[in-house]
Amino acid sequence: MSLIKSCQTQKFEELLVRKGNAEMRIKLGVRSTKVLQILVGVLMRCWVFAGLTILACILVYWTYGKLFAFLLLCLAIIGIFYHIEDNLLFHPDMPAHSRIFVPVPSMFGMPYESVNVRSSDGTLIHLFFIRQPGPLAIRVPTVLFLHGNAGNMGHRLQNVLGLYQNLQCNVLMLEYRGYGLSQGNPTEAGLCMDAKIALDYLASRSDINHKEIIVFGRSLGGAVAIDLASQLEYAQKIWCLILENTFTSIPEMAKVLIGWRLLHYLPLFVYKNKFLSLNKIGHVTVPTLFVSGLADNLVPPRMMSELHQKCGSNNKQLLQFEVGTHNETWTSPGYYHSLATFLRDARVRRGIDPPSSPPPPSFNESV
């Protein structure tokens, strides 16, 4: 009998090992595919420079030998990746026509203003301001919504409808430079600049409650939001910060997505866009809610935990949703109720009176 059990145990262990090996092969295959896609994308965008580099390496190899040719190749690869990092990080053309057609809030029954402002470097930036009806607008919070790295702000309108209805708030949607109908080209410095002008725009309006401005950032937008809230001049204008499925830094994300051991040894100056959120989050002191989808297959949920742990706010909370994916955590049951609860508690802790109009009696989580 014991011999039979021993055989069964051995077979079970063998199955586990096979399963583990299969999963490892799948992961390695996926990672190799991602790396190959990146390399092909680089060559397609820089084929002239890549061709000249190969020719130069051949000439150097003939003239000076292998070592100098190898060094030249390494420098060329670093240079190529540095100059096309914007194309690897920012995807304003996904899906197609995202720079031409931007869905508008009225398609979801929300009244809005289409606003154009100039960023501090003169770049024209497009905004949607979605306002609660009548005098209610000045008594409720206003959310500055910072979206992720692909598409345009119109692609987030269903989520914004949920915020508008369930949190009973105004919403200012920012279209980064180079996205949608905004001018310019996206860069780390440019996006952070655009967020500042959007917050300044809210501060200039006389028809909203300046004491309850919430900055919401998802994914790349979370990194922009952290930069904004980490600076005292702008933190003074922010009541609460909500971060969803964002990352600790671009170098750390590169290690996760590409998986090359070499990336662990590269100096920071190699990265054109850094978004060093983990270094900045310690300077964030406003009430901060970290919303993490545990089914996120792009940004590891541990990064949200690291940001939460290092955050400098005395009022911070990590909210985790088991079924939350990278872009769709907002569809998780209880999502809006949890956000509303955090804001209510923040209001109580600061002694702020609630809006005179009562909140909706129930939350429409299907929105």
Per-region residue spans from a language model:
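Membrane-embedded segments
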Residues: S120-Y201
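Short beta-strand/loop motif that positions the catalytic acidic residue
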Residues: H283-T285, F290-S292, D296
